[in-house]
């Protein structure tokens, strides 16, 4: 959930 902002998805792919 820390990399959610970097991935682009804030609640969909919070582990990406």
From Swiss-Prot:
Q: What is this protein called?
A: Bile acid-inducible operon protein I
Keyword Lipid metabolism appears in the UniProt entry: yes
Keyword annotations from UniProtKB, A to Z: Bile acid catabolism, Lipid degradation, Lipid metabolism, Steroid metabolism
- GO terms of biological process kind: bile acid catabolic process; lipid catabolic process
Taxonomic lineage of the native organism: Bacteria, Bacillati, Bacillota, Clostridia, Lachnospirales
The organism is: Clostridium scindens (strain JCM 10418 / VPI 12708)
Pathway assignment reads:
Lipid metabolism; bile acid degradation
């Amino acid at each position: 959930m820390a990399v959610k902002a970097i991935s682009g998805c804030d609640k969909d792919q919070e582990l990406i």
